[in-house]
């Protein structure tokens, strides 16, 4: 079983990293690209514009000689030039409010994105640790809050309640003939910020930036989608700058009819595409997942991606205690937050326990405690969310509605995991109570995004819960210097470690649907990535600098699971039989060979 092989796989992963045996991209000279634009038009097309990177002969062919400064720069030189300007911006904004600086950085990157996509993604890949927090969490939350004011040019597609009956034709307005990856939101629950309506489009854009940078999906084959069915955010409805439909959200069948129509339209035009649902409110996150997962190739990142990343971290905490992975069945876990992410994490963890112990999922819930805004969920609760019913405890064990600190003191859990979206809810009293945990190395996961919504900071966790804890968060925090001179390692338990690999592996396997087996394979692969030595130090997740290698490994694991589940139909010239005959190393090599890398293609004009 996978669980028994994690230590061995960790050593193999470490060896691969140490000896550099695999490269996650190709820098071979690409073939020519046919374009139908010339002159200034080509300079205004971010897919093909090279700025000062056009060779002189190409400038002649495309009629742009004299429209650019005479010096020809390589992509590397252009990257260096951009980074120099970016560092200058950092120096010039020192002392400014954090939000002001974050938005200034985002604007600078966004202007490059709008002008030259190849250079944008080269800069992003080469500086992923610095720039991921700007184009993705946590800055993307700030961008969404201000998107109507920040909007300058369109990116992605918008399908609204006013477009009912027109989507099958609208989908052909997208200029790219092929789309591989779609990320869609309805804006109803953007990170921990609530209903942001049409302004939630920033989330699909940021997610797809990570698909390109981490998974090597060709940027000309990605599509951000905003389904605007209205908003219940009165502040937005009263804002004259708001760019969305100014009406309350559609509900019930009216809502589902809009999403049904979009899904039919998208898969009619691009039947091989993979669709990722993102930041839907809990009832629709679960509802649409169950509605579409067996019909279309789709998954929900909040429910399944977050769960996979959390499960990988939870398995790591067992290893950090010096215990075998099989001891996960004995871990007591308190989950704070019963939304789509919280329930998704709890469900996947329970499934893992059931699988390990050979028991039913109902029996496997014994050591899981779910807390929502009304306290501990028990069988006394009325109007309980259907997804939470399985985890309701007997009130004879702990009273209905018990607070977090009550539950922690009573249960003495090995893990306290937060997906509540409530900043600071793990206060000093709660964190100090974790000192009495039954674990020799208690784990605290503050996974809510953005940073202001994190259940606690890393500094507070190590200060109040003790220096021997394992800490993970959804947004980035700096490592903490402890009083004994050691370092309290901060792990970013972010979905970026999984969703790019899930999407890439699904795409290259040609899977008809995304199965639980594929998702579990992704999680187990991530769990096995770190060495025992790293885990003993409290390091559960790898450096984001290795994101392309991580994604290749996860993608290969997903592909192999698709083959095992007999749903892989192949991709391009690689058929299902070819996939089934691939070794583990073959699948990783196959994945890496198909990862796009930003280099300038020679452009050839045709009328």
From Swiss-Prot:
Disruption phenotype: When associated with NAD-ME1 disruption, loss of NAD-dependent malic enzyme activity associated with an altered steady-state levels of sugars and amino acids at the end of the light period. Keywords: Metal-binding, Mitochondrion, NAD, Oxidoreductase, Transit peptide. Its EC number is 1.1.1.39. NAD(+) binds at residues 189, 302, 449. InterPro entries: Aminoacid_DH-like_N_sf, Malic_enzyme_CS, Malic_N_dom, Malic_N_dom_sf, Malic_NAD-bd, Malic_OxRdtase, NAD(P)-bd_dom_sf. The active site is at residues 136, 207. A divalent metal cation binds at residues 278-279, 302. Optimum pH is 6.6 for homodimer and 6.5 for NAD-MEH heterodimer. In the presence of coenzyme A (CoA), optimum pH is 6.8 for both homodimer and NAD-MEH heterodimer. It is found in: Mitochondrion. It comes from the Eukaryota. Induction: Accumulates during the night period (at protein level). Residues 1-32 form a transit peptide. One of its GO terms (cellular component) is cytosol. SUPFAM superfamilies: Aminoacid dehydrogenase-like, N-terminal domain, NAD(P)-binding Rossmann-fold domains. Its main location: mitochondrion. Activated by 2-ketoglutarate, phosphoenolpyruvate (PEP), fructose 1,6-biphosphate (FBP) and coenzyme A (acetyl-CoA and CoA) as homodimer and by oxaloacetate (OAA), 2-ketoglutarate, succinate, fumarate and CoA as heterodimer NAD-MEH. Repressed by succinate and fumarate as homodimer, in the presence of NAD(+) and competitively toward the substrate L-malate. Expressed in leaves, stems, flowers, and roots (at protein level). Present in pollen. One of its GO terms (biological process) is malate metabolic process. It catalyses: (S)-malate + NAD(+) = pyruvate + CO2 + NADH. Belongs to the malic enzymes family. Homodimer. Heterodimer of two related subunits in NAD-MEH complex. Interacts with NAD-ME1. Involved in the regulation of sugars and amino acids metabolisms during the night period. This is NAD-dependent malic enzyme 2, mitochondrial. It comes from Arabidopsis thaliana. The lineage of its organism: Eukaryota, Viridiplantae, Streptophyta, Embryophyta, Tracheophyta. The gene is NAD-ME2.
């Amino acid at each position: 079983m996978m669980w028994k092989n994690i230590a061995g796989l960790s050593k193999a992963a470490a060896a691969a990293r140490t000896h550099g045996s695999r490269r996650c991209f190709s820098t071979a000279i690409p073939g020519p690209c046919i374009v139908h634009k010339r002159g200034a038009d080509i300079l205004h097309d971010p897919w093909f514009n090279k700025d000062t990177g056009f060779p002189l002969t190409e400038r002649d062919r495309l009629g742009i000689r004299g429209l650019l400064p005479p010096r020809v720069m390589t992509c590397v030189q252009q990257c260096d030039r951009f980074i120099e300007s970016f560092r200058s911006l950092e120096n010039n904004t020192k002392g400014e409010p954090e939000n002001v600086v974050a938005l200034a950085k985002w604007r600078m990157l966004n202007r490059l994105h709008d002008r030259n996509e190849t250079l944008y993604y080269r800069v992003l890949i080469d500086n992923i640790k610095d720039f991921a927090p700007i184009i993705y969490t946590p800055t993307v939350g700030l961008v969404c809050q201000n998107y109507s004011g920040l909007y300058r040019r369109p990116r992605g597609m918008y399908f609204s309640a006013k477009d009912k009956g027109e989507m099958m034709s609208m989908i052909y307005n997208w200029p790219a003939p092929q789309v591989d990856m779609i990320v869609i939101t309805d804006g109803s629950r953007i990170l921990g910020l609530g209903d942001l309506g049409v302004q939630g489009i920033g989330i699909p854009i940021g997610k797809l930036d990570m698909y390109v940078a981490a998974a090597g999906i060709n940027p000309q084959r990605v599509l951000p989608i905003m389904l605007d069915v209205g908003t219940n955010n009165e502040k937005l409805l009263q804002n004259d700058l708001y760019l969305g439909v100014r009406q309350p959200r559609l509900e019930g069948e009216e809502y589902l009819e809009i999403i049904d129509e979009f899904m039919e339209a998208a898969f009619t035009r691009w039947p091989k595409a993979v669709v990722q649902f993102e930041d839907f409110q809990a009832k629709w996150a679960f509802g649409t997942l169950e509605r579409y997962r067996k019909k279309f190739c789709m998954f929900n990142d909040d429910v399944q991606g977050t769960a996979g990343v959390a499960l990988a971290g939870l398995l790591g905490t067992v290893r950090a205690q010096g215990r075998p992975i099989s001891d996960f069945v004995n871990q007591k876990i308190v989950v704070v937050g019963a939304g789509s992410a919280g329930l998704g994490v709890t469900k996947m963890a329970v499934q893992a326990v059931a699988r390990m112990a050979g028991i039913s999922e109902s029996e496997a819930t014994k050591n899981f405690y779910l807390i929502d805004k009304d306290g501990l969920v028990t069988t006394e609760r009325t109007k309980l969310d259907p997804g939470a019913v399985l985890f309701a405890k007997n009130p004879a064990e702990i009273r209905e509605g018990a607070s977090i600190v009550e539950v922690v003191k009573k249960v003495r859990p090995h893990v306290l995991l937060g997906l509540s979206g409530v900043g600071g809810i793990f206060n000093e009293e709660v964190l100090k109570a974790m000192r009495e945990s039954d674990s020799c190395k208690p784990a605290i996961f503050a996974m809510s995004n953005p940073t202001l919504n994190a259940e606690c900071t890393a500094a507070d966790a190590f200060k109040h819960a003790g220096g021997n804890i394992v800490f993970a968060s959804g947004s980035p925090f700096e490592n903490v210097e402890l009083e004994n001179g050691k370092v309290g390692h901060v792990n970013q338990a972010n979905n970026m470690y999984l969703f790019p690999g899930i999407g890439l592996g699904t795409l290259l396997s040609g899977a008809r649907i995304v199965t639980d087996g594929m998702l579990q394979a992704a999680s187990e692969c991530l769990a096995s990535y770190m060495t025992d030595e790293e885990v003993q130090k409290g390091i559960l997740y790898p450096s984001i600098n290795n994101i392309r290698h991580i994604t290749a490994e996860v993608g290969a694991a997903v592909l192999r699971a698709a083959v095992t589940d007999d749903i892989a139909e192949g991709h391009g010239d690689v058929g299902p039989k070819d996939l089934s005959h691939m070794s583990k190393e073959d699948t990783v090599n196959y994945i890496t060979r198909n990862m796009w890398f930003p280099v300038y293609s020679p452009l050839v004009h045709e009328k």
